[in-house]
Amino acid sequence: MAKVGKRTRAAREAFVGKDMVSVEDAVALIKGAASAKFDETLEVAMNLGVDPRHADQMVRGVVTLPNGTGKTVRVAVFARGAKADEAKAAGADIVGAEDLMETIQSGKIEFDRCIATPDMMPLVGRLGKILGPRNLMPNPKVGTVTMDVAGAVGNAKGGEVQFKVEKAGVIHAGVGKISFDAEKLAQNVRAFVDAVNRAKPAGAKGTYLKKVSLSSTMGPGVSVDLASATSH
């Protein structure tokens, strides 16, 4: 335990006095302080000037990171017939209809992304209370209710990240592994922040992007200069 404590303390000391730094400096600091025995994820937290309790201030979307996430994404697809075959050929991990619904209802959820063809939504809709809170409910706004199941599976496995604002006006996402090259992590951060900026809802008033922080899975966070966090 003492060893872990020293490591954590050393990591935190490296962050003292570091605030509103560039993305590159933040990434370098986080990579240098990462000390977990596994390949940690670089995580972005964005504080937005929205109140998601109002429908016209909801922020959600999807972005394909230029350098991927480094994460193995397990994909489930609700489809029948030719579309089910298409999903399997594209590399979906689980494909089904009523059988998949029953598996999920039993509490067995072994996937990170759920895709459905439009005709399957009446069936999938019964799972709203299970999938909704886990942010797994297929949604046409983020391309997971589609007839192009092969494309959706490919995107999910190829570095696509979904985002949705939480009650406090915060968006969290993993944008790569600490083992990634620093430049690639910086590119991913900016791609994600740009996507959230583009998703600014019509009802947002005042300052939209308030704060951007970066951290590793186990490490402390550091605030990033907002101008540095965007690519333009």
Curated annotation (Swiss-Prot):
Keywords: Repressor, Ribonucleoprotein, Ribosomal protein, RNA-binding, rRNA-binding, Translation regulation, tRNA-binding. Gene3D superfamilies: 3.30.190.20, 3.40.50.790. GO terms for molecular function: rRNA binding; structural constituent of ribosome; tRNA binding. One of its GO terms (biological process) is regulation of translation. It comes from the Bacteria. Pfam families: Ribosomal_L1. Binds directly to 23S rRNA. The L1 stalk is quite mobile in the ribosome, and is involved in E site tRNA release. Protein L1 is also a translational repressor protein, it controls the translation of the L11 operon by binding to its mRNA. Part of the 50S ribosomal subunit. This is Large ribosomal subunit protein uL1. It comes from Cereibacter sphaeroides (strain ATCC 17025 / ATH 2.4.3).
